[in-house]
């Protein structure tokens, strides 16, 4: 079978002395050079705090004020306080804010509708548009809040108040289970230390909910002091101008601190723009299509450009996370929707952003001291959803809308971009709050089936912040000397970059191979020669290719397990990895048959051009393809099965579960043929219940008999086809 390719790599020792020596010199040899820097002194400057122009804080610091919220309905029964302030950032144009009442106007039912009106515009109610009453429209001379309302048969009326603040709103008082008060006041200035929100009050009948038409905040305490503080960002701007005047130059500064004949210390100060891109990767498991392995936040490499003091800057950032929380969801397979693990960004999750740009400051960034940074935080806010495409029924959805990060500190780091290793700066941010996540049985408005705190999914949305960095760098006094860091690289990181670039192409090709072609290849005796034929673009000798592949293959778990001494008894954990060299039937198909067939077929169509990438793909296919494997043994009509989730036994004739005998199992594992569970127990049971398969055919399916499996595939049996396709979907790099 095709797994003979792996067994050949295990049993034979390909080598090429010259090739390995060259590779070792390129990747492993370390040369240490000591340079006498000469006599120079450090000039310690007093601490300086740098800003990044005026920054308006859009998030409140009081825990009693939450938001912004994006949902379109407020259920009044969900409000825990009797006094609730509904607050809005001042819109840029006339817009409807909220409505309380029936869906359409009724002369005998009370309702009210709140609008924001831009100065010198006419505000016309949507709810009362069908009436001939002139009160349905209002001309406003200032930025205003306009409340249109009627109560029972009372004629339509309106109330207009000034809205001069950047953030403001109305007070809602839940006076009883059936009545509410709407309180409004002119929001003109901040001359007083307190504010009367109840200049105008009207009592209305209480509906079950209010419709909301734009983002909003909720406050359970008087928010006046918070709004007043947010109204005064001009102080930051004034301080920034004072700093600029004091330094008598641009904020982007190159200052020689000390200098001798060979070296000089230069202090760099730069404004930087930092972008944050968060993206999730959804991995689908095998089985019938209801099983999803994980939803994880990827480590992202992101490039962007911006202008700094008239200079065009090309920046590269790498975004990664630490201290993520994990959740899972779902019932027992095969037909219950399940997510094995999904990451949660929650309070105290750390986000690392490694930053590098192509400007002068990074060209000699080798010896650095006094690194300081002043960065703004990130308000990563956007409604994002992912829908799991299960075979039957509505697609469940995972939804997140926002998380906020606060800057913690900065340090030096190293990142890798386009085959080049670069010295960079790492900015550490900590998650401080989030809007929560939830799952629905269908679209976002369907029934919620799970929820929690934190942030669970992102579609690649990008946001940014600004800040300032300063540091002192030791560089040659003669500018013609340059350090080689801008062109340094490691073979390993270059290889990772190549694999990352190939990943999507490889996985797309692997998923597009015809099922019949894969099974035909899996049943053929693949050898190392077949692998070489699949990569004709590699221009190395067969000997060098074999040596390189073998050297990499020696690092795999498969090779290490096969090379260690065999024991008289197996523990279950070892059994699931040590089956490579155990005896087996010549007609039985195993997992390695499938993985090697997918690997050879896909590399053939990829047309690889270098030996290192081929070696890496061979190694990864051996260890990573089909990670969840189950094995079984048969004795006297009894099947003993070991899976990553546990062990069980069942009668082959009836498929009824029997007591599992651990001692018997371990005896069998050391001397009986071990069978890959190509057709799993759930599929076997479904075949028996659906088609009434005979005992003889059932035995062949349990034994993973290749001709029998192929026969069912050729006859388009949906159960067998779905199972094999599920295994193929697990063959990914």
Curated annotation (Swiss-Prot):
Task: State a single Pfam family of this protein.
Answer: Rota_VP4_MID
Which Gene3D superfamilies does its entry note?
1.20.5.170
> What is one GO cellular-component annotation here?
viral outer capsid
This protein's record includes keyword Membrane: yes
InterPro entries named among the record's database cross-references: Rota_A_VP4 (IPR042546), Rota_VP4_MID (IPR035330), Rota_VP4_MID_sf (IPR038017), VP4_helical (IPR035329)
Q: Which GO terms describe its biological process?
A: permeabilization of host organelle membrane involved in viral entry into host cell; virion attachment to host cell
Residues in coiled coil: 492-512
Q: Which UniProt keywords apply?
A: Capsid protein, Coiled coil, Hemagglutinin, Host cell membrane, Host endoplasmic reticulum, Host membrane, Host-virus interaction, Membrane, Outer capsid protein, Viral attachment to host cell, Viral penetration into host cytoplasm, Viral penetration via permeabilization of host membrane, Virion, Virus entry into host cell
Q: Where is this site: Cleavage?
A: 228-229, 244-245
Which superkingdom does the taxonomy of this entry point to? Answer: Viruses
Q: Could you say which protein family the record assigns here?
A: Belongs to the rotavirus VP4 family.
Q: What is this protein called?
A: Outer capsid protein VP4
